[in-house]
Structure formats: C-alpha cells, structure tokens
A protein has these predicted regions:
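Structural beta-sheet core signal
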Residues: 38, 144, 171, 194-196, ...
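Acidic, Mg2+-coordinating active-site environments of NTP-dependent enzymes
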Residues: 68-73, 78, 84-97, 192-378, ...
Length: 511
C-alpha cells in the first residue's frame, strides 16, 4: 500500500491524539491533504499537545470515543501503547473499520524532503538549534514537531517529524543507550546527510562499556553509507569507527587548532588505549599503535579568542572571520560543525551563515545565566555526563576564575559515572554543593576519607532520599536549597549542572 492508494476524501480517525506519536500522525495526514478526526480520553484542558494542533482543521472528541467518531472514520490509527484487548478494538472490529498502525503510516507516507541528522554525546541540541536558526534566517523552513517541552530525539518523534510539512528536516538523533534505535531513526527518517559532534562515555549503566556505547552511535555511520557525513576529526572514536566500518561515502572533517589542556586515555576502536592530547574532553591530537591518527582537517578553526568570542575558520575555499555570542572552546567546535552543515547541506554562502551565527545567543539550559543575586551570577547547564561536565567546567574556570558548582546529576552510567562526575567537579571548582542524592553519597565518602575537604564540599545534612528518573537527580526544593547554599559562599560565579538544574531553574525566583 502507498499514499496514492488513498482517495483525497479519505477520513483518518486517530485515537490518542493528545499523545506525542498520534499527534504527529494526525498532522502528517492533514499536511498530505486528507481529512483527519481525533479522539482522546483526556479533557481538552488536559490534552498535553493540544497547542500543536492549532491551525489544523482537525475535529477532536475529548474524554470519550463516541459513535460519531467511528461512523466518520474510513481508517483508524490507534496509539502504539493501546493494548489489543482494549474495548475500543471490539468497536473497530464490530464496525469492520481497517486499522493502520503507526508503523504503517511510516511505511506508507514517505519523507518528501532532504533530511539532516545530528548525533553525538554532547553538543547535539546546540548544533541542531543553531542550524535551524540559520535555515529560518535564510527563508528555509525546517520541520518542527512543536511538542511542547519534548526534546524530540526519542525514536518515533524524529521519524514522524521528518514527514511533516517543511523545506528540510533537521533532526537531533539521540539514543537512550538502546541498540537499534539510531539505525531505525536514520533509516526511517531517510537521512540524506548528517553530523557527529563527538563520542565520549555515556549510558554505560545500560550498555556495560564504552565500546558498546560507541557501536550504538556507529549505527548512524552505517545508516549513512554512501552519503555525506560531517565529523569531528579530532575524536579518535569517530575516526576509528569510520575506518572499522570501511565507510564509503563523503567524509568532511572539522576541528580546532588550539593548545591541548592535558593528556587523557581513551579506548581505541582497535581495543588498545590511546593517549589523547585533549582540547575538549575526548577530542584533540592522537596517534594509536594501530595507526589511527588525527587527520588533516577539511575545516579548522584557528586564532581563537575566547574573551572576544572570535576565531578564524580555514575552509577548503577561503579563510573566514567568525564572531559568535557563545562562550567556550566546546562551542567553537559546535559552531564550526554548523558552518560546515549550513554550507554543505543547506547550500548557503558563508556570509549568510556568519550573519546568523553572530546573533545566536544559545540554547535554554546550556551555559544559561538565570539570575544575578547580589554580586553573584547563577548559571545553569544541562551537562550530565563526565565529558560534558569536564568540558563545561573547564571553560567556566578559564573564563571566570573561581566557581561554585551545584551538582544535581544522577548519571546514566550509574555509580561509576557519578564518581567520575564528582571528581571532575572537584578538579575545577572552588566549592562544591552536592544537591543530588547521588552526589551527596559521594561527598560523604570523600569527606570521610579526607576531612580537609569539608572546607570545599558544602554538605550540612545527610543524604536525601530521592529516586532518580533518568538523569534527573534532584527535586525542585533540593536544587533551590543547593543554589541558596552557594549564594552564602565567597565566590561570585555559581553554576548548577544537570537536568534538574535546568528543569527547575525558576527556583532562583524565590531566592
């Protein structure tokens, strides 16, 4: 069955239209010119994604599945989560209405535009958001899922999003450490090209080891075989996977010419340990016994002035003067990757790209200043894995000197990840305020081992009883109390890190 098999006057009935997947399905079908009606057991006031249906002529029945809905529908699309034993399936069978599953919609209604995917451990959201801004600034409309407070990199969302109306697709491709997820997103979103920011340890609790995680990310490379791939050439994991998979397609590399901040070990794809002269965590200059080494880069940033937020970019064609509002060397990597993507995928001239970059203030929850209280600035950042924490805190210390770090993280790599994060915070911070239960446990152990750390680690109560949800490691009250404690210390720059810090950033309004 394909799209042409449905007459123009076909009416599709979508059950569970207040849920993310069926909301997107309804909008796809309406975008393709069909009649769509919806139903949901939620009330109109409680319909989570009701706002995204505004502008669509879709009749929605709330709080019930009325007879009228089934009388009007030529086909029914139920939500994935609805069990086949549900009473509504008895009604569908009794009325002999054909059923299409969400996966049928994906198979039948093909992607009709170029689609670009962005993956990696850190930097995905900033890269995706900036590339979209450049598109909008140049009258190119990227598809938007418009699902309020949804990040949008979960499996079905990017796949369905790619089928909505728009000139191009620009998709963040994430994984919760589940093998096969990225493969399905890349294939079903019909990516034409993509970008990998970096690959550093994450989700180790689910996968067991770094190489297992890296090979989940490698599904992105496999899915783009024969196509265009833009990569951070200073990440040995990415370059090692490209070699291991014998990638046959166009590879465009980018990186940064900067003095390394130190040397760290990283597992090479060959199985050996490789010393990386790091510019940011996990990326820099490297040479492994297996022969893997930093390549000559196609795009390279030089003469970086972080204070003035400027750098020169050497492209295959010319040298560019780049001005940005973003802070930190990690954002130089992000901006360079975006420049390459905007030029190669969006086919925009450099001058148009640079104009847009110069006015990009960043993404909510990424190095975001949320308050100035007295003489103290409070910043939140989503950093939630060891590499992300190290990179962000190193840049903050470089830019501002002494910092107080409030930890709200519960690592997706379990206790090992929590300990590694705490050690990174210990390295770069004047003071540490452990606000998450996971960090408080480690703080107790650290102080027991080294009592002198009481001056640095501010822990004036026992371990909070909090059950983590993903990387959400603290409650609203715990984040607020942590920041409040930080305000009483003799340090004027406070950074609260982790998902809870960004989710509950409005807690500063009460301080």
């Amino acid at each position: 069955m394909n799209e042409a098999d449905f007459p123009e006057d076909t009416t599709f009935g979508v059950i569970g239209i207040c849920g993310a997947n069926c909301n997107l399905v309804a909008r796809i079908l309406k975008d393709r010119g069909f009649d769509v009606i919806g139903t949901d057991m939620s009330s109109g006031d409680d319909c989570r994604f009701k706002k995204s249906l505004e502008g669509y002529d879709i009749e929605v029945f709330y709080e019930s599945h009325p007879e009228e809905f089934f009388e009007k529908a030529d086909y029914i699309i139920p939500p994935i989560s609805l069990p086949k034993t549900a009473e509504v399936f008895d009604i569908i069978q009794e009325k002999n209405i054909p059923v299409l599953e969400v996966n049928d919609i994906i198979d039948i209604f093909k992607v009709n535009k170029p689609v670009f995917g962005i993956t990696g451990t850190n930097g995905k959201t900033t890269t995706t958001t900036l590339l979209k801004k450049i598109a909008y600034d140049n009258n190119i409309a990227p598809v938007e899922h418009n699902l309020e407070k949804m990040q949008g990199n979960a499996e079905y969302i990017p796949i369905l999003q790619s089928r909505l109306n728009g000139d191009v697709g620009i998709l963040e491709v994430g994984t919760f450490g589940v093998p096969g997820t990225i493969e399905r997103i890349v294939g079903n979103s019909e990516l034409t090209s993509g970008l990998i920011t970096n690959i550093t340890p994450d989700h180790l609790n689910d996968l067991g080891g770094f190489m297992e995680y890296a090979h989940v990310k490698a599904e992105f490379i496999k899915g783009l075989a024969g196509k265009q791939l833009i990569v951070n050439g200073q990440d040995p994991t990415i370059m090692g996977l490209l070699r291991e998979l014998n990638f046959e397609g166009e590879i465009i590399t980018f990186g940064v010419d900067e003095m390394p901040v130190g040397v760290a070990s990283k597992e090479c794809v060959c199985g050996k340990t490789i010393d990386v002269k790091e510019i940011i965590s996990g990326s820099g200059y490297y040479l492994c016994e297996c022969g893997l080494t930093t390549p000559q880069l196609d795009y390279i940033a030089t003469n970086i002035n972080l204070k003035n937020r400027t750098f020169e970019l050497h492209t295959p064609d010319e040298k560019l003067e780049v001005k940005m509002l973003l802070e930190g060397i990690h954002n130089v990597y992000n901006v360079v990757g975006v420049i390459v993507a905007a030029h190669e995928f969006l086919k925009l001239p450099y001058d148009k790209i640079l104009e847009s970059i110069a006015t990009f203030g960043g993404v909510s929850g990424r190095m975001e200043k949320v308050a100035t209280i007295g003489e103290k600035d409070v910043v939140v950042d989503f950093a939630h894995n060891p590499a992300g924490v190290e990179t962000v805190l190193r840049e903050f210390k470089k830019l501002y000197g002494d910092i107080t770090t409030v930890i709200t993280i519960s690592s997706e790599s379990g206790a090992e990840g929590d300990l590694e994060i705490f050690n990174k915070v210990l390295e770069f911070s004047k003071y540490i305020v452990p606000a998450s239960s996971a960090s408080q446990k480690i703080a107790n152990d650290k102080i027991s081992e080294r009592p002198e750390l009481k001056e640095k680690i501010i822990l004036d109560h026992g371990v909070d009883d909090f059950v983590k949800k993903g990387t959400l490691g603290a409650t609203f009250d715990e984040v607020q109390e942590g920041i409040n404690q930080a305000l009483n210390l003799d340090c004027n720059m406070i950074i609260a890190i982790g998902e809870a810090a960004t989710k509950f950033k409005k807690c500063v309004n009460n301080l």
